[in-house]
Amino acid sequence: MQMELTAQRIKTHLEDLSKYTSTPGQGVTRFPFTKEARMASEYIMARMAEIGLKTYMDNSGSVIGRLEGQIPETVMIGSHLDSVRCGGAYDGIAGAVCGIEAVRAIVETGIKPYYSIEVVATNDEEGSRFKSGLFTGKVMDGQLSVDDIKRYRDEDGISVYDAMLEYGLDPDAIADNRRADVKAFIEVHIEQGPVLEAAKKDIGVVDVIVGIRRALVTVNGRADHIGTMPMNMRMDAVEAAAKVIANIGDRARKYPLAVATVGNLNVEPNILNIIPSKVTYSVDFRGTEQIHIDEQYQGMINDLDAVCSRFHMTYQIEETLNVAPVKLNDAFRSYIEESCHERGWSNMHIVSGAGHDAQVYGARMPAAMIFVPSVGGRSHCPEEYSEPRTLAMASATAFDTLLQICKEKQL
């Protein structure tokens, strides 16, 4: 692998892909099942085809390039194609591009790998449009039903089901797309935090990916006049929600490596002189221990019960995501370390505080993640950046790891 050429190709591809956004000049916004996703998918498939891969779009809307091996069982490498709103040009898509470069290097060796290898650019990992996420991994694992994809809707009321139809996919076959042939998963990703840069390390070897439990909470009050309704008779949805929300962060601080975040806060009727009748907010609990996540979730429910009872109000919770923490494969992590050692690159073990495709795959098969430093620790913003040099390093490490996996023949 020629590192300078690899770095230049990665840089060019990411610059080109950053143009497929619905918010030009304000970062990358590339939601699933949109024209921007379609254009980026076509670009990625063209790059896959250039190195001789068989390309196609699967029924989740992800794009795949396949290199046939000696046997049909498959090792998959890649990351996601979609983005958050007004995000960066590296989150997810850099991993898909690095996957192409790793497989390019295998093709150039002329070796037919033992396992077939697929590069994947997955769809709707972020959950930014439909408030769920990790879509491709769930589809490939057979976790989603037709009822599920009819239930998840975007802010315009469009369901995943209808969006898939419009995109030319078959939502009624969503439960028939489990990939039992995929035996391992490798993901290159930007760190999205400051740890590697602060430690002056080239590569992060991910030990564990945090679990995530996410929900939409609605607190129902009653709209009344703000001046004439006494305080002891009010059903103020904002006051009730605020009391619950105030405890969420404090509760998370009691647990090591746990975080909790409230966002996407909506108030109705959102008018100056009317007591709020409804508050809807998203909440996201993360941690390396499932029991810590669940205790925080239950603590919020207990608070909702108490506060809504006090104010004679009601609430609803819709759980939109619940994935357990995943410990990544020991052997694969050792392959990554060995590659770094042999190539003279510094590395360190790290925990991923972000959710990733690899955690869905890693729950049922050997999986690994390779992190590259994020400059300034910035991510999910237009300022997001990782150096092409370190992305090329990650591609080379992924290449070495894929070869080692194929050599072992023990998946």
Predicted segments, located by residue:
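A short beta-alpha structural unit
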Residues: 32, 261-270, 282-284, 288-289, ...
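Zn-dependent metallopeptidase/amidohydrolase metal-coordination segment
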Residues: 10-23, 75-79, 346-397
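A generic, well-ordered mixed alpha/beta core segment in the N-terminal half of proteins
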Residues: 85-156
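His/Asp/Glu-rich mid-to-C-terminal helical/loop segments that flank catalytic regions of hydrolases
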Residues: 225, 229-254, 299, 372-411
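Midchain, well-structured core segments that form catalytic/ion-binding scaffolds
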Residues: 124-125, 131-291
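Catalytic-core environment of secreted peptidases
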Residues: 47, 51, 63-94
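A non-catalytic alpha/beta surface segment that caps or lines the substrate-entry region
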Residues: 22-68
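N-terminal capping segment at the start of a domain
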Residues: 2-34, 123, 380
